[in-house]
Regions:
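Negatively charged, low-complexity tracts enriched in Asp/Glu with abundant Ser/Thr
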Residues: 1-22
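Acidic, Ser/Thr- and proline-rich intrinsically disordered linker/docking segments
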Residues: 2, 7-8, 27-28, 34-82
Length: 82
């Protein structure tokens, strides 16, 4: 399974330049270049942007939250290495 598709059951898709998060009645695209703050708290991943928007992604385990955290960091690094 590709890294970008690993989190689809949680409503998260990792693209080359942005993250897409879908909830019941909301769909959000967060460009990696706009992420100012990224943290893991138990099984939640918190993303805050430069404009102070905050997205909280609820995952099933802390390990999954940590894995998503690491994968987002990889995508951010790729963005700035290009």
């Amino acid at each position: 399974m590709k890294r970008s598709e690993k989190y689809l059951k949680y409503g998260v898709k990792l693209e080359d330049r942005y993250l897409i998060y879908e909830e019941e009645n909301r769909r959000v695209a967060v460009p990696y270049a706009h992420i100012a703050f990224l943290s893991v708290s138990k099984n939640n991943l918190v993303i805050q942007t430069n404009s102070m928007e905050k997205v909280v992604i609820k995952l099933d385990t802390e390990d999954t939250a940590n894995a998503l955290f690491e994968d987002i960091l990889v995508f951010i690094q790729r963005l700035y290495i290009r």
